[in-house]
């Protein structure tokens, strides 16, 4: 070390090289430190934006309720929106299985229950299947056991969306009658014929239509959500689900 120090001290050329190398080294360290800081700042920004989106979605639901009551000439002081949204973050996921699952960092302590719908800003994600106090397991659309009611947006024909276990980017809309007009690029949305998802949330877009079957079309749907890039989601709370379920169970139980 002493010899190295003497060489640097008494040799202008070596001193210049050392100085340049040190500048590059410390410059790289500084750049890495900046990148790390920016990463955590970006993470905080994403969390903040996700929380803001939750507030906006809940306010929109309240606005829609207020608008409907005004249009109908009825004012209800204790009115609450049908749907509310709880923010959550993806902490684990699988993509290469036939029965994929997602894990969220919210659970019973956060007001989440089984069979609550999950969506993202891009569209439908899946359905809450299991819970603990602080976590939730979601069965996503890319699980062969997943089925949701969806419809063609332009004509409201409804069918059942089911994944075939092959490609995480695509699913299939079944039970659409053969005579229905469907074109590539048509938008597929939630039908509203369930107590889980509000009507009109984007599911995906028609990729192709198979007309070879006898009575029904087989519609390949490019899913709106890119599951490999999924990060923050909204868990959907239906405030009137229990009332509807109870009424249907009493009057139409078979």
What is the meaning of each model-derived region?
Residues 1-109, 113-254:
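Extracytoplasmic/periplasmic terminal helices and flexible tails
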